[in-house]
Amino acid sequence: MRIELATIQDVPELQELQHKAFGPQCIELGWKDAPPMTESLEHAYEEFSQCTTLKILDDEGRIIGSIRGNVTDGSLYMGRLMVLPEYRQQGIGKQLFREIQRLLPHNRAWLCTCKQVPAPYEFYLREGFRPYKDEIVGPGQTWVYMEKKIRERL
């Protein structure tokens, strides 16, 4: 397995990964209209152009995980950390999560995650992120905003 920068040609495969990674949970929770499930290919291309996206490939060159990030005023936003279900619990998400932070210089990192899905929330806590805001976005849907401030090195 290897981590690489994704290219614009990867967008259709990344969108397929997104459906496979988030689809089962969205369906289970009754969120058929959740953004990861309803995003058009055109919008996916737009989003791609505004972020740095990393992908992790299996030995056959298939994308099995991804994350995207964008730094504004020293603040790194990370989103869409996703791994194919059959590759979870192998440290792939952790590798991507740490690599995007290493790659993009920042003094604060932030993200949002769904409060109703505990595994990602618990992972982010273990990685040193702390909640700072909740937002109800729909029936049974609450986003938790989390951040991690980076100390300046002396």
What is each model feature region?
Residues K55, R62-N70, Y77-M82:
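Conserved beta-strand in the GNAT
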Residues F97, Q116-P120, I136-W143:
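Short glycine/proline-centered loop/turn elements that form peptide/ligand docking sites
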Residues L103-K115:
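Conserved GNAT acetyl-CoA-binding A-motif
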Residues H43-K55, Y77:
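A short helix-loop-beta-strand connector motif used in the catalytic cores of GNAT acetyltransferases and
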Residues L125-D134:
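Conserved acetyl-CoA-binding loop of GNAT-fold acetyltransferases
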Residues R2-E16:
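A short beta-loop-alpha structural element at the N-terminal edge
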Residues V83, Q89-R102, E122, R126:
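Conserved acetyl-CoA-binding loop-helix of GNAT-fold acetyltransferases
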Residues E16-A44:
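Conserved GNAT-fold acetyl-CoA-binding loop/helix
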